[in-house]
Swiss-Prot record:
Organism: Phyllomedusa tarsius (Brownbelly leaf frog)
The protein's name in its UniProt record: Dermaseptin-3
Lineage top rank: taxon: Eukaryota
Record-level GO BP terms: defense response to bacterium; innate immune response; killing of cells of another organism
Function: Antimicrobial peptide, active against the Gram-positive bacterium S.aureus, the Gram-negative bacteria E.coli and P.aeruginosa, and the yeasts C.albicans and P.brasiliensis. Has hemolytic activity (100% hemolysis at 128 ug/ml).
Length: 30
């Protein structure tokens, strides 16, 4: 239970970070 929740949370966070990273590729860092 807890382990699965941690994995899910980590995946969500990684997805968010990846989105931010990919989104910043076409824009200059501010």
């Amino acid at each position: 239970g807890l382990f699965k929740t941690l994995i899910k949370g980590a995946g969500k966070m990684l997805g968010h970070v990846a989105k931010q990273f990919l989104g910043s590729q076409g824009q200059p860092e501010s």
